[in-house]
């Protein structure tokens, strides 16, 4: 979609792009094997690149990085155990959407939604990776 709409945004001298990424790249999560985390990392870096490359043309691009968000996704994907995570870990989808819109309108490149998710992302940077991976493995075993 960016490829399709970016040229007209450049011609108009104005545009806003939101890419829905995830908290996953910021925290260790061995249960997200495969391509999920790498794709989300790409979305974040892609958003940063578009934002910086086209900022002088009036275009802002934001990567919105929510944690667990209440939608039908987890149940439809057969991730029933994730859907049973404690309520305090979840965000409302309307809140995530509103925060994402506010972020792009204010020129913020990366948004980690919610205080708890920001705390998790910061904590993952501070704790040695060997410890955070061990914690993630333990939590994953409990959930499945």
Language-model regions, residue ranges each:
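Active-site loop immediately N-terminal to the catalytic Tyr-X3-Lys motif
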Residues: 27-34
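Short, flexible catalytic-loop segment of classical short-chain dehydrogenase/reductase
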Residues: 66-76, 80-81
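A short, exposed helix-loop element centered on a Lys and neighboring polar residues
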Residues: 2-3, 48
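C-terminal helical subdomain
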Residues: 63, 83-121
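Conserved catalytic Lys-bearing alpha helix of Rossmann-like short-chain dehydrogenase/reductases
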Residues: 39-47, 61
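Active-site helix of classical SDR
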Residues: 2, 38-39
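Active-site-adjacent segment of SDR/Rossmann-fold oxidoreductases
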Residues: 8-9, 27, 49-59
